[in-house]
């Protein structure tokens, strides 16, 4: 595994497990404590904390967590899977003996049984930073799940959500007004038809505040994508 080419910190989080077979997180309490401490530390270094998220399988665990916490939308039944047979929700809910919404008020159990390490750590970092810095969650469905977890745990502080125009349109079409749904301060970044992911909206928002237009950000992203795919200097067309 290659180390990131930027400052980073390790939380020691083990990989999540298959929620169809058992609890997805073996020590969610330790993950929460690590994330909370990290959030508090980072909040002391500036007046704003922007969080992105990237976790293999995160779209599935986010759907499972949101369904368990009572959120309703067709998109939550649209699991990205090529397998035939029962859906991830049908498997996990059968194991737990629950129906949609049965874990309302038991957010930590929902995250422990159905979530993933990044989901818990993102929520914990947000909670740890509350009161010390403005927190902006950057992403789509996974950050919506982190926000839902925080609200279920009783966090009433201000939570900001940055997302791209494309992702905001998709989420609003599925859930309605996101601000009303979870009391979020929503900031939408215009990156055309690019869906959010890995903190793209937050990074673009910070870059725009530093004088870089969205078009320039997109062009650079497509060029880098082309270089990665071809191993040679790419172009916007080559990176599509």
Enumerate the language-model features and the residues they cover.
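N-terminal loops that bind phosphate or other acidic moieties
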Residues: 1-52, 56-240
């Amino acid at each position: 595994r290659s180390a990131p080419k930027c400052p980073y910190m390790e939380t020691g989080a083990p990989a999540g497990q298959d929620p169809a077979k058992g609890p997805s997180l073996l020590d969610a309490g330790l993950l929460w404590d690590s994330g909370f401490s990290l959030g508090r530390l980072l909040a002391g270094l500036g007046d704003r904390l922007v969080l992105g998220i990237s976790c293999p399988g995160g779209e599935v665990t986010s759907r499972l967590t949101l369904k368990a916490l009572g959120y309703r939308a067709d998109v939550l039944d649209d699991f990205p899977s090529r397998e035939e047979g029962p859906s991830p929700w049908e498997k996990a809910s059968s194991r737990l003996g629950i129906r949609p919404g049965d874990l309302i008020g038991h957010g930590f159990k929902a995250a422990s049984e159905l979530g993933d390490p990044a989901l818990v750590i993102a929520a914990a970092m947000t909670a740890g930073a509350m009161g010390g810095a403005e927190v902006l969650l950057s992403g789509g469905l996974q950050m919506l799940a982190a926000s839902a977890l925080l609200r279920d745990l009783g966090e009433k502080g201000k939570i900001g959500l940055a997302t791209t125009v494309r992702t905001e349109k998709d989420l609003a079409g599925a859930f309605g007004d996101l601000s009303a749904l979870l009391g979020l301060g929503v900031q939408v970044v215009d990156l055309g038809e690019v869906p959010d992911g890995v903190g793209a909206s937050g990074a673009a928002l910070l870059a725009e505040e530093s004088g870089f237009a969205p078009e320039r950000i997109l062009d650079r992203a497509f060029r880098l994508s082309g270089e990665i795919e071809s191993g040679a200097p790419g172009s916007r067309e080559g990176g599509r």
